[in-house]
């Protein structure tokens, strides 16, 4: 498929048959996009911005510049800041900074529980009115089943979106890589795939009773995928997978490649292929 695209001030004004070739000013810059792809602005649903508290890592300005360079025009920010995003004043701060410093769309989330402690549920209704689009404890998982059931009930009543990082803390404690041959070879604590599966299975079981809006932020294993396949006809939910787990496996960690100690960890090649097939 070929054709012309007219871009003015960063926006597509005309495309394909709507472009009149005779009316294109001679001063216009032409870019050959042969063998290239054009997408609408991409959305990143799991972004950790450094404001407030970790500006030395990243701020809204550097975040938006990096996002635009990769074709991302909208991001969903996680609440794992310092202080955390768990009250109205912090939401107001985040929205103001995003509006003043960012060149992209910022969609903030707030914590599921106060101060990310996993105990006391946050004020979903109040924070939604302030513009929060969903609730998550980010890189932390709600470990207490009773707390999670209360969260789901409230989320159903208020039509709130719940985003869960699926990982059993006790099973993953001190883990750095996938539990397997590579972990043994490197002498590192491993994170078993069933640490993820257990939380996925628990939450999807709860979801059968509460049927709230629920999203698993990232899965990494074939075992979790099997649970999802069994549940998808009974409950309504979505799930994500990291590009890391689609393009890399545990063998890529190698010696001293600490930047590949990820959460969730890189799994086996069989896991990677299963995730690709699942998509």
Residue ranges, per PLM feature:
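Histidine-rich, glycine-flanked metal-binding segment
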Residues: 1-40
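Divalent metal-coordination and catalytic microenvironments
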Residues: 10, 35, 46, 67, ...
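Metal-associated gating/positioning segment near the N- to mid-region
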Residues: 34-98
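Active-site mouth loops of central-metabolism enzymes
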Residues: 45-58, 81, 107-120, 139, ...
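Short, acidic/polar
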Residues: 56-64, 116-126, 202
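Alpha-helix-loop-beta-strand connector modules within alpha/beta enzyme cores
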Residues: 88-109, 153-167
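Histidine/acidic residue-rich metal-binding segments in metalloenzymes
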Residues: 121-279
């Amino acid at each position: 498929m070929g054709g012309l695209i007219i871009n003015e001030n960063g926006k597509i004004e005309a495309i394909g048959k709507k472009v009149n070739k005779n009316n294109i000013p001679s001063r216009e810059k032409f870019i050959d996009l042969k063998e290239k792809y054009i997408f609408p602005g991409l959305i990143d649903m799991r972004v950790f911005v450094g404001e407030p508290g970790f500006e030395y890592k990243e701020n809204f300005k550097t975040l938006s510049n990096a996002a635009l360079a990769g074709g991302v025009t909208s991001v969903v920010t996680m609440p794992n800041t310092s202080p955390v995003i768990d009250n109205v004043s912090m939401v107001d701060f985040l929205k103001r900074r995003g509006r003043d410093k960012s060149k992209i769309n910022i969609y903030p989330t707030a914590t599921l529980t106060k101060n990310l402690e996993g105990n006391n549920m946050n004020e979903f209704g109040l924070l939604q009115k302030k513009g929060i689009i969903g609730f998550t404890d980010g890189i932390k998982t709600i470990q207490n089943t009773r707390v999670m059931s209360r969260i789901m009930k409230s989320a159903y009543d208020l039509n709130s979106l719940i985003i869960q990082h699926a990982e059993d803390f006790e099973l993953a404690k001190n883990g750095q890589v996938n539990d397997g041959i590579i972990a043994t070879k490197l002498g590192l604590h491993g994170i078993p795939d069933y640490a993820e599966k257990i939380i996925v299975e628990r939450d999807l079981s709860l979801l059968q009773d509460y049927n709230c809006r629920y999203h698993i932020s990232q899965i990494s294993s074939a075992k979790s995928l099997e649970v999802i396949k069994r549940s998808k006809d009974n409950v309504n939910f979505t799930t994500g997978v990291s590009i890391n787990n689609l393009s890399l496996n545990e063998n890529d960690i190698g010696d001293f490649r600490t930047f590949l100690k990820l959460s969730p960890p890189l799994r086996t090649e069989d896991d990677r292929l299963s995730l690709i097939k699942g998509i």
